[in-house]
């Protein structure tokens, strides 16, 4: 049996971005202490490259960068990878890409290759592809009903892709 705990933050409050560097460091240290009691810790961060995001990305373990095929998403993902890979405080060298809302597997692969090529050409690194999550109406349905995707639609294509990514990360 698998179990997990969730520590929820305030969405869109701006509080994290307003913390001083010392406060961010204390929060990161607290999360690192809690992490010792778990097999995996997932920190869901906002898009962007503000100090809070890059500091938490430096927590040891794989860093998943979620990207869609929209140009702004690819640009944000590239900027994050650049800052994270060049930050001397960062231990996040295991950067992996998750392509979300891909219309087809080929479109997802193309999105990954666009980002990967830019990283290779300009940063000298190639992030691994963690997985491709297809666009799936079951996701919107689960959100509308405020129910976890795999509870509401256990056979959803997006859910299967997410489960595969999670399984790969666990091993």
What are these regions (language model features)?
Residues 1-36, 89, 141-148:
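P-loop/Walker-type NTP enzyme "switch/lid" segment
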Residues 28-40, 50-72:
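Inter-motif core of Ras-like GTPase G domains
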Residues 88-90, 119-126:
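Short helix-capping segments at alpha-helix termini
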Residues 74-92:
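Conserved C-terminal guanine-recognition region of P-loop GTPase G domains, centered on the G4
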Residues 122-150, 162:
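Beta-strand-loop-alpha "switch" segments that mediate conformational coupling across diverse proteins
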Residues 17-19, 45-56:
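Conserved ATPase-coupling elements of RecA-like P-loop NTPase cores
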Residues 153-171:
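A cross-taxonomic marker for long C-terminal extensions/tails that follow the last structured domain
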Residues 68-69, 95-110, 132-139:
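G-domain G4 guanine-recognition motif of GTPases
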């Amino acid at each position: 049996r698998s179990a997990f705990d969730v520590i929820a933050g305030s969405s869109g409050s701006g509080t994290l971005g307003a913390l001083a560097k010392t406060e961010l460091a204390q929060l990161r240290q607290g999360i690192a202490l809690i992490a010792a009691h778990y097999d995996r810790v997932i920190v869901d961060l906002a898009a962007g490259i503000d100090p809070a995001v890059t500091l938490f990305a430096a927590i040891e373990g794989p860093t998943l960068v979620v990207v869609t095929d929209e140009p702004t998403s690819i640009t944000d993902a590239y900027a994050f990878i650049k800052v994270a890979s060049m930050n001397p405080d960062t231990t996040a060298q295991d950067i992996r890409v998750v392509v979300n809302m891909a219309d087809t597997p080929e479109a997802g692969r193309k999105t990954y290759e666009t980002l990967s090529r830019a990283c290779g050409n300009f940063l000298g690194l190639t992030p691994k592809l963690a997985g491709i999550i297809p666009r799936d109406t079951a996701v919107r349905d689960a959100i509308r009903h405020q129910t976890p995707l795999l509870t509401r639609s256990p056979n959803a294509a997006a859910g299967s892709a997410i489960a595969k990514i999670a399984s790969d990360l666990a091993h």
